[in-house]
Regions:
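NTP-dependent small-molecule kinase module
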Residues: 2-47
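Hydrophobic residues at beta-strand termini and immediately following loops
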Residues: 24, 288, 539
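Residues that form or immediately flank small-molecule/cofactor binding pockets and catalytic motifs
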Residues: 26-28, 290-292, 488, 544
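Low-complexity, highly charged intrinsically disordered N-terminal segments
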Residues: 45-95, 220-223, 227, 250-253
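Short, flexible, solvent-exposed loop/turn segments with mixed acidic/basic and small polar residues
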Residues: 84, 240-247, 472-474, 528-529
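Domain-scale recognition of functional cores that engage charged ligands
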Residues: 89-131, 136-434, 438-454, 459-460, ...
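Primarily single-stranded nucleic-acid-binding OB-fold modules
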Residues: 398-426, 435-442, 450-456, 460-563
Length: 563
């Protein structure tokens, strides 16, 4: 008791004196081990000119100090851009399938799925702020006492706002908003058209009412059905039932932000029971957060720490690449990965067909890979088998071994093949390029001269290099984030996915804050550098599979409207 009292008095005196400190928990041995590690790191921090105060903030943010040093080195030296060799196209890195072949692959998956544990992984942590960006800008800049909405649209050349207002009654949230407006403004019916539209937008985004820009996309009304309005959570539950269930069980994993988890759970409580009842399939739902330890420090143009008004360090999330750690924690034979906003109101059967077909491609290739690795382990591979495996690597996995391979001894050839095959596998749907912003499939050369298939974002390309720009512009396909992943090896053990990340494929993100340049580091993207060393198969899939809602006006597209 006296010890606890002494500790709390001592702690308070440190707080009063504004002295940085770290509180350790655990038994004596673990506290001692932690203390030694902290002291070692603190002395390292001091060598690099980092104050005790800053060190404590970094420690409390759970970021290993070596990671901070790595980030500072990256800010100083920059990051090499991707070296594009050519776009991946059908018959040159992208597998093209006929409708019959899609059906055949899907049927193969249906045949095999009962012996597999399936899971759907949906990144869903972001707020919907970007979705309503043009509406927020309108509310910030528009003064209804000084100009008309039409004058604002002309002044700003804001076609998005014009479309939003013209098609307002087509949005699935229109009726609920209209009802609320009539409660708030008793004279709403007789108001001028501009006032009606202005109040509609204001109420939609107001924190006192609908507050849509601060909510996660997952809980927003997306689709108007005859009987009800569905949000993306419900649509993902429906998709689970259609293609991600085996033995009457489906598993769904959302990555969410901590502040939004209650919103998810409240929705899931109602929707899960409804979908389970209609389908007869049990759906297990789990959540995880993006680890704080994957955040980045923020620096200025001199690579010095940037601080807020309270003199605290500023940390930023490390981007969706951080989710490789969440994916690494999952246990399943086949994992479907899809973004929260890529759902459809109609044609769910068609979507299911293509998802199942991708899974069929994965299982077929995986069977062959596992068979070869099993034979290698049992030493059943002979010299005359190598040609067949080399052809498989080339034709099915787009891996060329190069001329040096022929000079290897038999033992080294087998070791090389084992190293190439013993990796997680991803099958990625690719849609026809229609000018959407985002990444695409390319043949890329790394710093060791090795060429492989990668999904590359525009921000990874040197846009000042004419040749690279031409290759980027020649892309025929686009990455819709439509992945099916195999994360277990031939012994049915989970891979450590962190071992297959290309740490050199991150991004430096530059932003202007109060007129000053600030930089932060974004981890290699989940489907970019985080999976750079996976076995990769790209499959062309129809555009019907890609229906993202990036802005609120996307809800006006046919895929999100009643038919």
């Amino acid at each position: 008791m006296v010890e606890k009292l002494f500790f709390s008095v001592f702690k308070q005196s440190l707080i009063d004196a504004k002295k940085p400190f770290i509180t350790l928990s655990g038994d004596k041995e673990s506290r001692l081990a932690k203390a030694i590690a902290i002291i070692d790191n603190l002395s390292l921090a001091k060598q690099h000119g980092v104050s005790s105060d800053d060190f404590v903030q970094i420690y409390n943010h759970e970021i290993p100090f070596e990671k901070i040093l790595q980030q500072l080195k990256i800010f100083k030296n920059g990051i090499l851009k991707s070296n594009l060799i050519s776009p991946a196209k059908i018959k040159n890195g992208i597998l093209g399938l006929s409708e019959d072949e899609f059906k055949e692959k899907a049927a193969f998956f249906d045949l095999k799925k009962e012996s597999l544990k399936l899971k759907k992984f949906v990144p869903a942590s972001g707020a919907a702020s970007r979705m309503f960006k043009f509406l927020s800008a309108f509310l910030n800049d528009f003064d209804i006492t000084r100009e008309t909405i039409n004058a604002y649209i002309n002044r700003k050349k804001d076609s998005d706002l014009s479309i939003f207002i013209v098609a307002m009654d087509k949005f699935p949230f229109f009726e609920a908003l209209d009802k609320k407006l009539r409660e708030i403004y008793l004279d709403f019916e007789v108001l001028d058209r501009d006032y009606k539209n202005y109040y509609f937008i204001k109420t939609l985004l107001s924190s006192d009412y609908f507050d849509f820009a601060n909510k996660p996309k997952a809980v927003l009304p997306f689709h108007q059905y005859k009987t009800h309005i569905a949000n993306p959570i419900e649509e993902h539950l429906n998709e689970c039932v259609h293609y991600a269930s085996s033995n009457e069980v489906s598993n769904l994993h959302f990555t969410v932000s901590e502040v939004h988890q209650n919103l998810f759970e409240n929705e899931v409580e109602v929707l899960k029971e409804k979908v389970e009842k209609e389908s007869g399939i049990e759906i297990n739902i789990a959540y995880s957060y993006q680890n704080k330890s994957t955040d980045s420090i923020t620096v200025n143009d001199q690579n010095e720490f940037v601080r807020d008004k309270n003199n605290n360090l500023i940390f930023r999330p490390g981007g969706h690449g951080a989710l490789i750690e969440n994916l690494n924690e999952l246990d399943a034979d086949v994992i479907f990965v899809k973004n929260i906003d890529n759902v459809i109101q109609n044609h769910i059967g068609k979507i299911a067909l293509y998802k199942k077909a991708l899974a069929g491609v994965l299982i077929k290739v995986q069977q062959k890979v596992f068979d070869y690795l099993d034979k290698i382990e049992k030493q059943e591979i002979k010299e005359n088998n190598l040609e067949e495996i080399v052809a498989f690597l080339s034709k099915k996995l787009n891996i060329e071994l190069g001329n040096d391979f022929n000079k290897f001894t038999f033992e080294n050839k087998v070791n090389k093949i084992k190293d190439l095959l013993d990796r997680p596998i991803r099958v990625c749907g690719m849609v026809k390029n229609e000018g959407e912003p985002g990444g695409g499939p390319f043949w890329v050369m790394n710093d060791k001269g090795s060429i492989s298939l990668q999904i590359v974002e525009t921000s990874q390309v040197d846009l000042t290099n004419k040749k690279q720009l031409e290759i980027l512009a020649a892309a025929t396909h686009f990455n819709p984030v439509d992945l099916v992943c195999g994360i277990k090896n031939y012994k049915n053990e989970k891979f450590d996915l962190l071992k297959f990340v290309d740490p050199k494929a991150g991004f430096i993100v530059e932003k202007s804050v109060d007129g000053k340049l600030v930089k932060s580091y974004e981890l290699p993207g989940l489907w970019n550098g985080a999976m750079a060393n996976w076995l990769t198969i790209f499959v062309a899939v129809p555009l019907i599979t890609f229906n993202p809602v990036k802005t609120v006006n996307d809800l006006l597209k046919p895929a999100h409207q009643p038919q």
